Amino acid sequence: CRPPSSPSLSWPPGLRSPALPRAVACARGRSAKRDVAAKRLRSRSPRMDATTGDFTALQKAVKQMATKAGTEGLVHGIKNPELRQLLTEIFMKDPEQQEFMQAVREVAVSLQPVFEKRPELLPIFKQIVEPERVITFRVSWLDDAGNLQVNRGFRVQYSSAIGPYKGGLRFHPSVNLSIMKFLAFEQIFKNSLTTLPMGGGKGGSDFDPKGKSDAEVMRFCQSFMTELQRHISYVQDVPAGDIGVGAREIGYLFGQYKRITKNYTGVLTGKGQEYGGSEIRPEATGYGAVLFVENVLKDKGESLKGKRCLVSGAGNVAQYCAELLLEKGAIVLSLSDSQGYVYEPNGFTREQLQAVQDMKKKNNSARISEYKSDTAVYVGDRRKPWELDCQVDIAFPCATQNEIDEHDAELLIKHGCQYVVEGANMPSTNEAIHKYNKAGIIYCPGKAANAGGVAVSGLEMTQNRMSLNWTREEVRDKLERIMKDIYDSAMGPSREYNVDLAAGANIAGFTKVADAVKAQGAV
């Protein structure tokens, strides 16, 4: 097993959602051809008024051209004319939101057989696709030098059809409205699959906690919660952690909420166990991914023992995914971050993984390149572990969205990968998923495979309301049962409609929410 001698290919920055690259590139005017087209449009449109700066006519014309190009790929393969029209309308509203449109298309394609059998659910899908509420706000804070810094905060309260909004907070420079909407949209169906009464939401900020002092992070979190507290409560919206939001940030956020509202309630999950948190919450997402694929393997008469696994990421999800894989007898070959990856030719030992966990616990911003081992090989240049030239049985993308593109998928297929289990949210592009399906790889989508995190968040909500704490064994037992229920829920529609596991998960999650919306009336 060795890293390749040449860098892997990847989509250019800004085109990480290949389903809509032409539309987005067109909208942003990134190519010479489209510049020429824009000039032609300008010649047929009113020119900008130098006094008023009126770009309206030009912007409208360019947007129409972008829409025409984008919708060609968006509706490809969709036969239902009403569904095609709906996707076109959604795209026309916000053509620049490529991550969101990627998520909507993926769900829409898988729901086609449902709309054929139950056409009355298509208007409900139209309602579900539009978020109930989108909140954006300014977050001002002082750095350690006394300088004023300003970031943007978001909370997308997408659907409360089956329970209060539930979803994490992400602090990362890449955060924007498109990413928040895609994550909140996915959260609806993920939460539905857990069988717990939770709606879908997501939030965060473009603030980057990396490189910030504890005092700076505290001041930012306090400013962020000063606005967010107006929109959340334990019966309305219950945020949790996500990328960039761990136990430290949750503590600062909870403290500020309590300080302002004078209420000690379970308004956040992922709290420390000293003040209302649950056992296994940090481990839950990574553990859940392993438990999910274990159910898939059991159905095939197999087990995880001896399976060679590639894991991306080095945060909580990746660490605890690797931890449970080792407990189950699997071989973990890699961990990674945005700068590169490290791999152990014979697999990580428990002691080596513990060294990574200790390093990250001491400094959450530590790079995976800082991991030291006599046997480890580090590959930088922002390369990804999917390029490793070795036999692979299971891939666990646990880093971020769209980390596996079409080329990466081809490499996994070449190296014998049989399963892709998503620990991150939407880590595979639509083109990569198409490659999986064509090659016969069993694809375990994030909305099912990584639902362990929100499942234990739901269990934390229950413990808070009941004013009790379950033991580690009790929580793990409940998590194992929930992941089994999620797998069974996805397999039911998969068999009924003769579709793959990913489509089955979408159908199961959607129909539960749609039936709830229908019962509550069109509002």
Swiss-Prot record:
Active site per the UniProt annotation: 202
Example GO molecular function: glutamate dehydrogenase (NADP+) activity
Cellular compartments per GO CC: chloroplast; cytosol
Organism phylogeny: Eukaryota, Viridiplantae, Chlorophyta, core chlorophytes, Trebouxiophyceae
Pfam families: ELFV_dehydrog, ELFV_dehydrog_N
PTM (free text): The N-termini of the alpha and the beta chains are blocked.
Catalytic activity annotation: L-glutamate + NADP(+) + H2O = 2-oxoglutarate + NH4(+) + NADPH + H(+)
Subcellular location(s) per record: Plastid, Chloroplast
Family: Belongs to the Glu/Leu/Phe/Val dehydrogenases family.
Transmembrane segments annotated in the record for this chain: none
EC annotation from Swiss-Prot or TrEMBL: 1.4.1.4
Species whose genome carries this gene: Chlorella sorokiniana
GO BP: glutamate biosynthetic process
Region spans: Disordered: 26-50
Record's protein name: NADP-specific glutamate dehydrogenase
InterPro entries, per database record: Aminoacid_DH-like_N_sf, Glu/Leu/Phe/Val/Trp_DH, Glu/Leu/Phe/Val/Trp_DH_C, Glu/Leu/Phe/Val/Trp_DH_dimer, Glu/Leu/Phe/Val_DH_AS, Glu_Leu_Phe_Val_DH, NAD(P)-bd_dom_sf, NAD_bind_Glu_DH
Keywords tagged on the record: Chloroplast, NADP, Oxidoreductase, Plastid
